[in-house]
């Protein structure tokens, strides 16, 4: 059990976090090609978010420095985790912190870095969410009531890997940031 605890950086892990950590350890022991890559990886926390159609999305929050290591094995790891947890889409996101905007009344000790601003964190969440695919364009549509809908255009070369998850991406992004978003994969007509 101590090896399961070592995969989770949380003090009091939930039942779902323990199940995912156990799956990580099972994958380490069963597949030799993933063993070296999975050993140093840890999870900060996991959230389960409801998506339309009775599906759920498992959002695994990982430390920011470990994100590049996760990207190396993300396609294989996602496939294996989705086999173990059916009817759930697995999404890896880095745990990022947003610092409040400095005001006149608050004492400013250090200048707020660009990477900790709300806009930068939301853009990085979007990039992490659609990782194997690249974002090729963004459009903002303003509705009559003043609401905004962001349209994100994804690269069409990875349609098979990502097409079935687009609704999950929309629900997760809306839940985490409060912004409405629509994903679109433009068709290649040459």
Swiss-Prot record:
Component of the small ribosomal subunit (SSU). Mature yeast ribosomes consist of a small (40S) and a large (60S) subunit. The 40S small subunit contains 1 molecule of ribosomal RNA (18S rRNA) and 33 different proteins (encoded by 57 genes). The large 60S subunit contains 3 rRNA molecules (25S, 5.8S and 5S rRNA) and 46 different proteins (encoded by 81 genes). Interacts with snoRNA U3. uS11 interacts with MPP10. Component of the ribosomal small subunit (SSU) processome composed of at least 40 protein subunits and snoRNA U3. It comes from the Eukaryota. Present with 43500 molecules/cell in log phase SD medium. GO terms for biological process: cytoplasmic translation; ribosomal small subunit biogenesis; ribosome biogenesis; rRNA processing. Its main location: cytoplasm. This is Small ribosomal subunit protein eS7B. InterPro entries: Ribosomal_eS7, Ribosomal_eS7_CS. Pfam families: Ribosomal_S7e. N-terminally acetylated by acetyltransferase NatA. The modification Phosphoserine is found at residues 10, 31. One of its GO terms (cellular component) is nucleolus. Belongs to the eukaryotic ribosomal protein eS7 family. The modification N-acetylserine is found at residue 2. Keywords: Acetylation, Cytoplasm, Isopeptide bond, Nucleus, Phosphoprotein, Ribonucleoprotein, Ribosomal protein, Ribosome biogenesis, rRNA processing, Ubl conjugation. GO terms for molecular function: structural constituent of ribosome. Component of the ribosome, a large ribonucleoprotein complex responsible for the synthesis of proteins in the cell. The small ribosomal subunit (SSU) binds messenger RNAs (mRNAs) and translates the encoded message by selecting cognate aminoacyl-transfer RNA (tRNA) molecules. The large subunit (LSU) contains the ribosomal catalytic site termed the peptidyl transferase center (PTC), which catalyzes the formation of peptide bonds, thereby polymerizing the amino acids delivered by tRNAs into a polypeptide chain. It comes from Saccharomyces cerevisiae (strain ATCC 204508 / S288c) (Baker's yeast). It is found in: Cytoplasm; Nucleus, Nucleolus. There is a cross-link at residues 83-84 (Glycyl lysine isopeptide (Lys-Gly) (interchain with G-Cter in ubiquitin)). The keyword Ribonucleoprotein applies.
């Amino acid at each position: 059990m101590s090896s399961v605890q070592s995969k989770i950086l949380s003090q009091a892990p939930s039942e779902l976090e323990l199940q995912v950590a156990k799956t990580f350890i099972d994958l380490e022991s069963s597949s030799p090609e993933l063993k070296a890559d999975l050993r140093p990886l840890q999870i900060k926390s996991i959230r389960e978010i409801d998506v339309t159609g009775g599906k759920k999305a498992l959002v695994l929050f990982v430390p920011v420095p470990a994100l590049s290591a996760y990207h190396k094995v993300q396609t294989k790891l996602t496939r294996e985790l989705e086999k173990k947890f059916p009817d759930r889409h697995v999404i890896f996101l880095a745990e990022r912190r947003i610092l409040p905007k400095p005001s006149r009344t608050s004492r400013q000790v250090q200048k707020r870095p660009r990477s900790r601003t709300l806009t930068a964190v939301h853009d990085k969440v979007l990039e992490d969410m659609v990782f194997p695919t690249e974002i090729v364009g963004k459009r903002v549509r303003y509705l009559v009531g003043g609401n905004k809908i962001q349209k994100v255009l994804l690269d069409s070369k990875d349609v098979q890997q990502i097409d079935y998850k687009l609704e999950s991406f929309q629900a997760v992004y809306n839940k985490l940031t409060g912004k409405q978003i629509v994903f679109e994969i433009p068709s290649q007509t040459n």
